[in-house]
Swiss-Prot record:
Descriptive protein name: Ribosomal RNA large subunit methyltransferase K/L
Record's function text: Specifically methylates the guanine in position 2445 (m2G2445) and the guanine in position 2069 (m7G2069) of 23S rRNA.
Root EC class: transferase
Cellular compartment(s): Cytoplasm
Entry annotated with the keyword rRNA processing: yes
GO cellular component: cytoplasm
Enzyme Commission number, as recorded: 2.1.1.173, 2.1.1.264
Domain THUMP: 43-154
């Protein structure tokens, strides 16, 4: 008997051990990412030819303790390598595992290589050559917890490479993953009608058809690792190949199982057909180009096993949630009596199906950990309301009903108001309901959802489910394309969080506000370039700017400066520490045709600039951060602690009768009025003048003050 190790991705061990037992292996022992077993040479060949789940089969030559480089060298040197391969054959070493004295897999591979070369030399035999690519004889070494296992890569190239795949589509499933899905779903025990409405390049269906036809998965492979092994018995191997070919021929003629595959991408369907033809099962599978939501149920019962699309790019998550929700509706309405098995890396997408799983498993798709859920659709289940009908029929989805009703009500009111007001970007919802802690802003034909950090006492699973429900419900509630919804997660403002990049890609739009035009960037940063709650404050700045010298401090993208310029300011100076936002402010001026020299831009630490400038102004607008400890500032800044010092430092910049419009977003901010009055400031709160209708539901979003200094 020979000792083997069947390697497989983590999570496949159980199914692999069952497969090995069915094939006749003995002394089966599950390990991490594989299974040890014993078998005769003939059975080792058979397992290599017939295993659908293993990644590779390793013939174990040595296994023992290893605590030092010397022990590793001695273990490899002690093997009679001339019994394993000829010196004329090239060899390579795949070393796996680290720990202890092994801090680099290359080090382990070199030690074994040195031992092999030295052993050949000491046995008076020419040394074999190392080949990094396509070696004749591949040695596999695995180090774990003080144990070294050295063996021959018996199977050769990865076993999931069956030989029938011509090219791959996007994110193709590996063949052994598809086989594992078929085993764990229960379909393999009783092959019945099988369909995959997201078939891609056809892997699940092809693997299933090969199972139903009793076709060995290795039958189309051209190369195996044992071919250059000295103890290889080609007669036995050829006999197993002949047997497998005969079984496949008989199995195909007896196969009565129906297979149905479809995909919305015609190129992938064409590829799936080519792959199925290469595998010899094309005539068993009915392929079609179709949207999964439109496929017809091919019988009263069967299995639907699939890997629907999933992705993590912002801007696609809402569309995917809509797809999964609609799939759940279709399954419940049309697939009564069917078993479903769905693989996905995003449990929130699976939750959008609104189906209760009979079983939930973990299964790796390459390095990506996925959930593999099994469902039974009972025939008595009834269809729920389709969310796409909310607007058309006046119905409300059974998901997040209070949220849907509130958003619809808000949107109906604000849509008319915004058109009359002359703005096309506004807030629809701002955590109006405690269970749905999000802010929703509409920018022309797009919506940005910002998720606030939930309280620590709310389980993460609850907040995720609520957010999922928001994303499912919103498109139909306000009639927006799911592809035009952008999701962002943010905490309450902390320091410079709002200025950090979150994506490399951009989505730039031009919005209009009281005649002013501003550039928006909806994806690249947490904020979009326009603080919507300051809309009336900017308008006020414009109204007060006629024939005045205006200063905008902590200017961000210079939107208040644009209003000042359009309001007829004599001059406008825009100061911000960020080069990005200073350039953005310049773009906003250019959009409005404001190119005069009287409009100046300064990139500087505002605190330091105030100390050094000698300029004078009639109107200063200042909207400092709530808190900042930027590396480019010498000291931290806290608006509650430091606002008196900040405002007093502006006195020297004011012309006689000059005014300051001071705003901040600190909740529960308390203005030190007495201290400011002692500095000859007249202080007036103007929140009522500067809180737009779309922010009336959240009066603490900001506070705004008008200060006049008396000489």
């Amino acid at each position: 008997m020979l000792n083997f190790f069947a390697a497989a991705p983590r999570g496949y061990e159980y199914a692999l051990s069952l497969e090995l037992a069915d094939l006749g292996a003995s002394e089966i022992k599950e390990s991490v990412a594989g299974v040890y077993f014993s078998a005769s040479l003939e059975l080792g060949y058979r397992i290599t030819l017939w295993s659908r789940i293993a990644s590779r089969i390793i013939l174990v030559i040595h296994k023992g303790p290893c605590e030092s480089p010397e022990q590793l060298y001695n273990a490899a040197y002690g093997i009679d390598w001339q019994m394993e391969f000829n010196h004329r054959s090239t060899f390579s070493i795949d070393f796996h595992g680290m720990g202890g004295f092994i801090n680099n897999t290359m080090f382990g591979a070199l030690k074994i290589k040195d031992a092999i070369v030295d052993r050949f030399r000491d046995d008076d035999c020419p040394r074999p050559d190392v080949a990094r690519v396509d070696a004749d004889f591949r040695i596999d070494a695995h180090y774990r917890r003080g144990q070294i296992t050295i063996g021959l890569n018996f199977s050769g190239p990865a076993l999931h490479k069956r030989g029938y795949r011509s090219t791959t589509g996007e994110a193709p499933l590996k063949e052994n993953l598809a086989a594992n899905m078929l085993v764990r779903s229960g379909w393999q025990k009783t092959p019945v009608t099988l369909m995959d409405p997201f078939c891609g390049s056809g892997t699940i269906l092809i693997e299933a058809a090969m199972i139903a036809c009793d076709m060995a998965p290795g039958l189309h492979r051209e190369r195996f690792g044992f071919e250059h092994w000295h103890r290889h018995n080609d007669k036995v191997w050829q006999g197993l190949l002949d047997e497998a070919k005969a079984r496949a021929s008989i199995g195909k003629t007896r196969c009565t199982t129906k297979f149905y595959g479809s995909d919305i991408d015609s190129r992938l369907v064409a590829l799936a057909k080519r792959n199925a033809e290469n595998a010899g099962v094309l005539d068993l599978i009915e392929f079609d180009v179709s949207n999964a939501l439109n496929v017809k149920v091919p019988g009263e019962s069967g299995y639907l096993i699939s890997n629907p699309p999933y992705g993590e790019r912002l801007g696609t998550v809402t569309a995917l949630l809509q797809l999964y929700y609609q799939l759940g509706d279709k399954f419940k309405a049309e697939f009564g009596g069917w078993n479903l098995a769905i693989l996905n890396s995003d449990v929130e997408l699976l939750s959008a199906l609104k189906l209760k799983a009979d079983k939930q498993m973990k299964m790796n798709n390459g390095a990506l950990e996925c959930a593999f859920n099994l469902y039974t659709v009972h025939a008595e289940n009834t269809r729920r309301v389709d969310p796409s009908k909310i607007n058309r029929d006046g119905d409300v989805s059974d998901i997040a009903v209070p949220f849907a009703n509130r958003v619809k009500k808000n949107f109906k009111q604000l849509q008319k108001w915004a058109k009359k007001e002359g703005v096309d970007s506004y807030r629809i919802y701002d955590a109006d309901l405690p269970d749905y802690k999000v802010a929703i802003d509409k920018y022309l034909d797009y919506v940005v959802i910002q998720e606030y950090t939930a309280p620590v006492d709310i389980p993460e699973s609850v907040t995720k489910r609520r957010l999922t429900d928001v994303l499912i419900t919103l498109p139909s509630a306000i009639g927006i394309d799911p592809e035009n919804i952008i999701l962002k997660t943010r905490e309450r403002q902390k320091g410079t969080n709002q200025y950090e990049k979150i994506q490399a890609n951009k989505l730039e739009l031009i919005t209009t506000e009281y005649g002013a035009k501003f550039k928006l960037n909806l994806k690249e940063y947490l904020d979009t370039g326009l603080f919507l709650d300051h809309r009336l404050t900017r308008k006020l700045v414009g109204q007060k700017s006629k024939d005045k010298d205006v200063l905008n401090l902590f200017a961000y993208t210079g939107t208040a400066s644009v209003h000042a310029a359009l309001g007829g300011a004599k001059s406008v100076k825009t100061v911000d520490m960020s080069n990005t936002y200073t350039n953005w402010a310049k773009e906003n001026f250019a959009l409005n045709g404001l190119n005069d020299d009287k409009y100046q831009f300064v990139q500087a630490n505002c605190m330091q600039w105030i100390k050094t400038t000698h300029d004078k102004f009639d109107l200063i607008f200042i909207d400092p951060p709530t808190f900042s400890n930027s590396k480019r500032m010498e000291d931290s800044f806290d608006v509650l602690r430091d606002h008196v010092a900040l405002l007093s430092s502006l006195i020297k910049l004011l012309n006689p009768g000059g005014e300051i419009i001071f705003s901040n977003n600190k909740r529960k901010f308390k203005m030190e009025i007495e201290a400011l009055e002692a500095l000859n400031f007249t202080v007036k709160n103007i929140d009522n003048q500067t809180l737009p209708l779309d922010f009336k539901r959240n009066p603490q979003i900001h506070n705004t003050w008008l200060l006049t200094h008396a000489e």
